[in-house]
Amino acid sequence: MKLFPLVLLAFFLHFCGSPRKIQTEKENRILTGADQTEKYIPLLKGKRVAIMANPTTVIGNTHLVDSLQKRGVNIVKVFGPEHGFRGNASAGVHVADETDPVTGIPVISLYGSKNKPSKQDLADVDILLYDLQDVGCRFYTNINALARLMDACYENGKEMLILDRPNPNGYFVDGPVLDMKFKSG
């Protein structure tokens, strides 16, 4: 009976002192499609690139457009979703075409009077890059914008590359099912 506390203590100390693999922040880091530049930049080199982008289109703290330009990618235009390329438009407000004051790149709005690129919009484009964060809610317009961009690329014989981002809600799905009489987009 006097050995039991000693055995229990030895057992406890064994597991307290056992070497464990300590997970580092780097091992736990989630990589988005945009983060994996070595996989997609070779596909963009020498091509005229359009990108569907907004403020969520980042690699770390740098906007993907800035990052790609620094790497020599020829970005010929940006397509802007709801809220605009720089995110300075309120929800539901018409967003006009413009020239981005930071990069000088033409920005074509796909929210408001036009929701899909025209043949003319894609005439000087070889490949369209899509990188928008979605939140997994049906009222978010990004998934509808993606579907229309895919249609436009197919109709005009253009390549499209989608840089995926994980759903921040993970595996949680909740909420009412859409009543089809309220469907839009």
Describe these PLM feature segments.
Residues 87-92, 161-184:
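Glycine-rich, charge-decorated loop segments at or immediately adjacent to ligand/cofactor-binding or catalytic sites
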Residues 74-84:
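Short internal beta-strands
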